[in-house]
Amino acid sequence: NSSAIVFDDLRYSSLIESLRPFSTVLSANPTILTGLNGNVSIPKINPGSTSAFVTEGTAVSQSDPTLESVTLSQKTGGAYVDISRTLMMNTGDSFSVENMVRNDLSRSLATMFDAGSVSGSGAGGNPTGIENVTGVNTSSFTSAGAPSYAEIIAMQGLIESDNVSLDGDTSFYITTPAMNSTLKTTAKNGAGSSFAQEDGFIDGYPVLVSSQVTSNTIILGKFSDFIVGVYGGMEITVDPYSLSTTGTQRIVALASIDFAVRHPVSFCVSV
């Protein structure tokens, strides 16, 4: 029996990476503010001043716009991985193992940020995602898992009725993989017509897909009105000391970010 002298050949260069949700919001052209420190307040006029025509010789009326603010406050998240001495010895290449872990932690942070931007609860240190922003437009579908084309298009009208101008560069639909598949087979005007989602677009607006979106939900928004506040950069620290008595090396990844919207009415979420 020769099995005792057959060794495993570990091919870390051919590592099969974990499957993670697609990143969406950062590809939707949001407004990104970098190098932030502490709480950041962005002044906002809501509602603005109002003008009106008057007859000759009549004084115009006073208008009192309301000044509000949009606030960003640091939300920190991260993870760590412990690499055992045995693993590093068995691979014979601690650098490759460390790089593998660094890359996975980086992807993990990106996934966490995307989840926060879409469905973050705003509680317990979490940022507030689009689905939970107070004041966004909401739309109810007759059949939650199978909206009609008219219902999907009606989301545009809800946003535009609030004086928001949608455009093909910064306005996107975002939905789940399952809903996206449904939209590809949802006829616009009955049998024989074209479909709601064709070639990655709905009525000229790009469609992004993410498993971070809540089941049966469709989001439409002008993402230039979505603000991503970045506090510093992603920090990855190699700590050989905390578990030095066992020869274990700890890799820690941390990053701080927050999200806000200029105008909640720039978004519509199906409920």
What does each model-identified segment do?
Residues 1-168, 184, 195-200, 206-208, ...:
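Acidic/polar, low-complexity extended loops/arms that serve as protein-protein interfaces
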Residues 56-61, 96-99, 188-190, 223-224, ...:
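Short intrinsically disordered coil segments
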Residues 82, 173-174:
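Structural recognition of the beta-strand scaffold that forms the well-ordered cores
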Residues 174-199:
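A glycine-rich beta-turn/hairpin centered on an aromatic-Pro dipeptide
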Residues 199-240:
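C-terminal hydrophobic structural anchor segments
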